[in-house]
Amino acid sequence: MSTQSPNHHEDITKTSSVNMTTTTTTTKTKAAAKAGTNAAPKQKTQMHRRSRTGCYTCRLRRKKCDEGSPMCTACKHLGLCCEYKRPMWWSNNDARRKQKDEIKMIIKRKKLSEKSSHTIQTSINTPPGLSHSLPTSATFSDPLDRNRSASIDSHFGFNFNSPQHGQDFAAFATPQIHVNGEYMFPPFSPYEIDMKTERQIFINDIPTLRESTVSTFSTYQTPPPPGTILPSFPLEGEWTEQVFSERRESLTEETFNANFFDFACDPAMASSQVAIELDDGDQKLLDHFVQHVLPTIFPILESNQHGSISSELVLPSLANNKGYLHCCLSIAAQHFKSTMGIQNEEIDNDIMRHRYATITWLCEALNRDENHQPILDATLGLIFFQCIVGRPEDTLPDIPWHQHFQAVVSLVQKLDLAGLVSDITKPLAHTPFNMTLTSWIDILGATMLGSSPLFAHTYRNKHLSINNHSLGLRELMGCEDRVMYLISEIACLESLKNQGMDDITLCQHVRGLGDEISNTEVNEGTLVEPYNANGTLSPKQLSKNITAAFRLAARIYLCSLVPGFYPAQPSCMGLVEKLTAVLQLIPSGVNGYDRSLTWVYLIGGSVSVPGSSFRDFFENRVAQLGDVANSGSFGRMTVLLREVWLQYEAILAAAEAAAGTSSLSSETPQQQQQVNAHYVRWREVMQIKGWDYLLI
């Protein structure tokens, strides 16, 4: 591979600082009464986590929703209808505008009613800081919905806002409650504050990635006068059953353990200044990488965490790992070229310059044979990032992914990562992230080559382990670890078949692996859309749906090894229809997870026959992705599937022409057998076309 030296033109270098900051600005304060002149200084406000999953009423009003159950604080305070399920008016602009006008009228009438009926003189003091605000109906809201980083193993520490002890429950059983307003509530006027929260990544003090939201905080209405008798509170009935049901569902929701992985770097560095020396051209590439590539790297991991795991993982390495930096800049140039549709020599030079610099750095580092962790990071980046960017028509020279993976295997062995995760006597507190990523590439990459995974023995031991079976694959890419281990076993069986295993032994192994796949379905229950009752994404249910899709794809892959297999078999067609039904439960579109199921679409689509519902469903999902569907592994898989279908239909057309009819119904058994024996296999198409893809 030859290209110009990175120093072929004069570099104008400068220090690039990558910084992630969060700022909060109070934009508006509303009070029911004028504050006193001798007001105390406001105390520091408590930040709220950003939420994209509030009720549709708050979304329409563009207000912060605390996701209270059964009603959020804002809707309860204003007497509005709180809807967590998508309402009919949401999908129509006119209906949405009408609904917004109705909400305004309701709020206006409520304010006028409060003003006319407000005859009680209340104390006029300066409102305290938010840290002294009273609990609202958010007492019943789910803290897990707002903080997905709660530990998966933690049984304690959940914030229920107003914890009660056993001796306190008697207060709720009294039929009447005598309230002293001065005792229960501090004597201040109710108020509302809108807070604008911004989260930015700065490079050279220039904002690149920016997230902004406006949140509203409201206190209770004015407390009743002393001596007021409140009506008894019904503790039984439909409302309390609904609250209990929703809380039980949210509390049993399994959340991602943020400390599950060992990222081999300090995540705290992601929030501090990261100094990088770059010239002006490379600075633009880095900006593009941070803005457009970084958020798409690990969508399943991000959905579990509701945070910025990719930033915590990647940004520190950019400053400390020169090979990794060149790799990311090359990927950024490749992504910029494909998304912007640019075809010129300058962008190609940027791609090849940084690609060459990465390979040069890796060769020098491997020759030194020291400090293996940064080398492993950069090598895995060369492999995995290609699954996110680029297009099938890319013609620039590159090293095949499986040659890079040979270096990965050597580095994993030197770091003894496979031994660390397999040692049952000393279980690790944190799974090495690079071992999890390596396993993902190893297992599905083996199916690309028709060979055994290089760490198949490790996966076999993990599968048989009772207490130490997880490698973190479910957390990283969505599929349960044991199902991935079985895909590894199927790849091993295919390798043995290619080496000449007899048909009887092959069928025995196929039956045994089929039973093992069935064992992973025990207690799975019915699959549903991955959303909670309040409309938030359920990571646990999403994982179940993704696992079910991989499980069906694994069955199809296993059945394809049976001698005499062909796609038009009723059993195969039935599996493809089941797979289509499961894929309908995966969120679609640019913000969905279809691109995380590239391998599943490949296996299922490659055996779908003309007229199958899978093909129409697949084309619909591609259309929903838009131009994004043409990039990365998903784009390459789409081109491969369409080529497989084209060649398969050509075989059918040739068979019809030979039979002298437009239908296969009158074909002789010999002609039908000939068509079945020559159905197009996706790996053969890749070999014919010279495609060396890693489709994960």
Swiss-Prot record:
Q: What Gene Ontology molecular-function terms does this entry list?
A: DNA binding; DNA-binding transcription factor activity, RNA polymerase II-specific; zinc ion binding
Q: Which CDD domains match?
A: GAL4
Can you quote a single GO CC term? nucleus
Q: Does the keyword Magnesium apply?
A: no
Residue ranges with Low complexity bias = 21-40
InterPro entries to which the protein is assigned, alphabetical: Fun_TF (IPR021858), Zn2-C6_fun-type_DNA-bd_sf (IPR036864), Zn2Cys6_DnaBD (IPR001138)
Location of the protein in the cell:
Nucleus
Residues annotated to bind DNA: 55-82
User: Its domain of life?
Assistant: Eukaryota
Residues covered by region (Disordered): 1-48, 112-145
Pfam families recorded: Fungal_trans_2 (PF11951), Zn_clus (PF00172)
SMART domains assigned to the protein according to its UniProt record, in alphabetical order: GAL4 (SM00066)
Signal sequence span is: none
Q: List compositional bias (Polar residues) regions by residue number.
A: 118-140
Q: Which UniProt keywords are given for this protein, alphabetically ordered?
A: DNA-binding, Metal-binding, Nucleus, Transcription, Transcription regulation, Zinc
PROSITE patterns referenced in this protein's UniProt entry, alphabetically? ZN2_CY6_FUNGAL_1 (PS00463), ZN2_CY6_FUNGAL_2 (PS50048)
Outline what the protein does.
May be involved in fruiting body development.
Q: Any idea what this protein is called?
A: Transcriptional regulatory protein pro1
Q: Which organism is it from?
A: Neurospora crassa (strain ATCC 24698 / 74-OR23-1A / CBS 708.71 / DSM 1257 / FGSC 987)
What lineage is this protein's organism placed in? Eukaryota, Fungi, Dikarya, Ascomycota, Pezizomycotina
